[in-house]
């Protein structure tokens, strides 16, 4: 998953995580431009709503392009089992969708995630990763610049582009809907 994410490989990501909206695909393409790789990936799991689903916290370090120090990070995934027994990431609960709410969520799963994230071991993990993250930013000016300036500026530009594209598509759809249908004269014999 993380190898594909760093490469912006939507085809591979889509085989692991579903659904991935068009906007999220675009965001992954943008973010992957700044990431060389993910390192030191560790998964922490608990059972989800049923025996075939899992709550997964993933700690990792992100190696950004042109930056020596890695940035500690923490991700969350809700993993389910397909009918054929293979696991997949239910991407409705991705950080992207949770932040942007492009797709509706199951309130039972959402509630379980909230409980999971407030459990003492998960809170401790979050605190540990946050401390390492703060220390890494304080120790490397290039890392701090990448995370606090470069990437936010790129995301701001991306959001503007997505909004402009959505507005253009809406205008075109409205204009198409407003076009009166003209009757074609029928030939008579």
Positions of predicted regions on the chain:
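Alpha-helix initiation/capping motif
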Residues: 2-5, 47, 90-92, 140
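Short solvent-exposed beta->alpha transition segments
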Residues: 10-60, 64-72
């Amino acid at each position: 998953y993380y190898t594909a994410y760093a490469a912006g490989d939507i085809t591979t990501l889509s085989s692991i995580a579903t659904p991935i909206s068009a906007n999220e695909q675009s965001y992954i393409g943008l973010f992957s431009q700044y990431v060389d790789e993910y390192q030191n990936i560790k998964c922490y799991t608990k059972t989800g709503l049923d025996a075939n689903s899992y709550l997964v916290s993933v700690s990792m370090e992100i190696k950004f392009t042109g930056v020596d120090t890695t940035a500690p990070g923490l991700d969350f995934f809700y993993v389910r089992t397909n009918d054929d027994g293979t696991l997949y990431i239910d991407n409705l609960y991705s950080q992207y969708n949770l932040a942007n709410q492009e797709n509706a969520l199951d309130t039972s799963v959402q509630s379980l995630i909230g409980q999971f994230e407030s459990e003492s071991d998960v809170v401790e993990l979050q605190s540990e990763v946050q401390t390492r993250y703060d220390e890494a930013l304080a120790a490397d000016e290039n890392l701090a610049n990448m995370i606090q300036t470069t990437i936010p500026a790129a995301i701001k530009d991306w959001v503007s582009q997505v909004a402009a594209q959505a507005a253009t598509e809406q205008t075109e759809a409205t204009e198409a809907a407003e076009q009166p249908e003209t009757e074609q004269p029928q030939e008579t014999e």
